[in-house]
């Protein structure tokens, strides 16, 4: 039962993320969020919540997508929902991260469909649109696979409590302690970042959450004291991973 709840939690998690993506990132940088963005965000959230509400039916049908007869026409309901969700996710990725990752994702989707035309060493029979959408959107091994699971089980929780810790002054305490110990030394901000990340890592236990939590403080401080943006980021990442 817990496994079922985890899978449903992933759907809620992605739906929440899609909603935020379209409400925070406009279609074009510098533009305001439009009514269309709000509609798309709601549509993306509903595509995810469909999995939450009808998860048992999806499992019982064993990957067969639902087709309903509406006004005498057979409508592939779940094919439409899944395809819509995938397209909205790609657009959210473009807005939040950039076009390169979207291009990579689209290339793999095309490879899944046109696999029989690929070179022999990587060729396969190819997936139909139904199987492709069904696997990508309604299966636990694709979009709702391990990365979303890690985000739900670890990253989100640690980032949330890291934000609470920061609001309560805990993050500042760790950094103040680190700066008090090594701040006057040569390269003090970098050493303080390493110590601060190590101490925060004892609480979070997650390198990614550790980077997000402590990097908010340490990277700007290192940049102010003369470290380049790249070096400051590299120091924070390495110290958070080892911490």
Give the label of every model feature segment.
Residues 11-28, 44-51, 80-93:
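Central hydrophobic cores of alpha-helical transmembrane segments in multi-pass inner-membrane proteins
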Residues 32, 60-160, 177:
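Hydrophobic transmembrane alpha-helices of multi-pass solute/ion transporters
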Residues 37-47, 81-87, 101-104, 193:
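Hydrophobic alpha-helical transmembrane segments of polytopic
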Residues 176-243:
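Hydrophobic transmembrane alpha-helices that form the pore/transport pathway of multi-pass ion
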């Amino acid at each position: 039962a817990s496994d079922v709840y985890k899978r449903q939690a992933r759907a809620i998690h992605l739906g929440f993320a899609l909603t935020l993506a379209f409400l925070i990132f406009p279609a074009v940088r510098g533009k305001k969020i439009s009514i269309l963005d709000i509609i798309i965000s709601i549509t993306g959230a509903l595509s995810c919540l469909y999995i939450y509400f009808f998860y048992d039916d999806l499992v019982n049908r064993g990957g067969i997508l639902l087709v309903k007869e509406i006004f005498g026409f057979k409508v592939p309901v779940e094919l439409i929902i899944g395809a819509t969700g995938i397209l909205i996710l790609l657009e959210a990725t473009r807005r939040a991260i950039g076009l390169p990752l979207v291009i990579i994702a689209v290339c793999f989707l095309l490879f899944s469909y046109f696999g029989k035309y690929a070179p022999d060493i990587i060729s396969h029979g190819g997936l139909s649109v139904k199987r492709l959408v069904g696997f990508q959107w309604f299966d636990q091994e694709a979009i709702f696979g391990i990365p979303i699971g890690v985000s739900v089980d670890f990253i989100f929780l640690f980032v949330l409590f890291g934000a609470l810790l920061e609001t309560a002054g805990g993050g500042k305490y760790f950094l103040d302690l680190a700066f008090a110990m090594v701040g006057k030394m040569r390269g003090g901000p970098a050493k303080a970042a390493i110590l601060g990340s190590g101490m925060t890592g004892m609480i979070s236990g997650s390198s990614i959450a550790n980077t997000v939590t402590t990097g908010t403080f340490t990277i700007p401080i290192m940049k102010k004291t003369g470290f380049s943006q790249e070096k400051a980021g590299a120091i924070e990442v390495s110290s958070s991973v080892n911490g």
